[in-house]
Amino acid sequence: MYNSSNIIDYVIDAWEKLQEQAPLVQCITNSVAANYAANVLLAAGASPAMIDNPFEARSFTEISGALSINVGTPTTEQIQAMQISAKTAHEHDIPWVLDPVGYGPILKWRSDMVDELLQYHPSVIRGNASEIGALAGSLVQSKGVDSTLKSDEMFQLAHNLLTKTSCVAISGETDYILSNAMTCIVKVRGGSHLQPKITATGCALGTLIAAYCAVAPVHLATIAAHIHFAIAGKLAYDQAQTIGSFNTMFMDYIHMMDANLIEQYACIELISDD
């Protein structure tokens, strides 16, 4: 049985393992996010590798601790690499995270490709409310790749996705995490309103989830990554209220995270999953 206290203990344990193991995370991500996501992983203690070449995908996925796939700016070659790596991860029980950026009727090509990737059962699907809602089959519209709906309007629909994945994370002002391994929904609060003003923060969160998945059970890894991000965002905003300075402090706190900060600042709520 989970409660707020023991979840925080599990998160601290996951963070400690992340520091000890520095897992190798293969990232097939978009051209806007690659540099930022790699730096977030390095700051958090993981080892990123941005291998998105279909000729190298299989061999590299086989040696990775986890895989992160983000469909933000897909190319034909990237899609081939995604399919190969997702299949390889599925065959070798390597955890992998799917970030269906922009999923919906407007961007049909990528959305069809995401539908194909679901056959390889991602360990985690992470997205904003509109992406998760669209993927779950609701009749929502997505404004580009930005969410037009609140997370709390979508989390019930996310249950539909738990037949395709072990865990669903809906990112927003408040984050919601649902999993087949829990009888509750975990709400994670924190962060800052400046985070959406910085490109690639959501994409980087997806890669951080993958890093934690390499060292902890999927549902706890997803919670840990969101708490890590939320605390870094809160503490960064306490120090800096302008975007440039906030971005620097945010990366600093991703790196400076420790057990004491997690215990002191993690803000979660468990709600009934009826």
From Swiss-Prot:
Under the heading CDD domains, the entry gives: THZ_kinase
- Binding, substrate: M50, A200
What InterPro entries has UniProt attached to this entry?
Hyethyz_kinase, Ribokinase-like
Q: Which GO terms describe its molecular function?
A: ATP binding; hydroxyethylthiazole kinase activity; magnesium ion binding
Query: Which cofactors does the annotated protein need, by name?
Result: Mg(2+)
Per its record, the protein catalyses:
5-(2-hydroxyethyl)-4-methylthiazole + ATP = 4-methyl-5-(2-phosphooxyethyl)-thiazole + ADP + H(+)
Which UniProt keywords are listed?
Answer: ATP-binding, Kinase, Magnesium, Metal-binding, Nucleotide-binding, Thiamine biosynthesis, Transferase
Name recorded for this polypeptide:
Hydroxyethylthiazole kinase
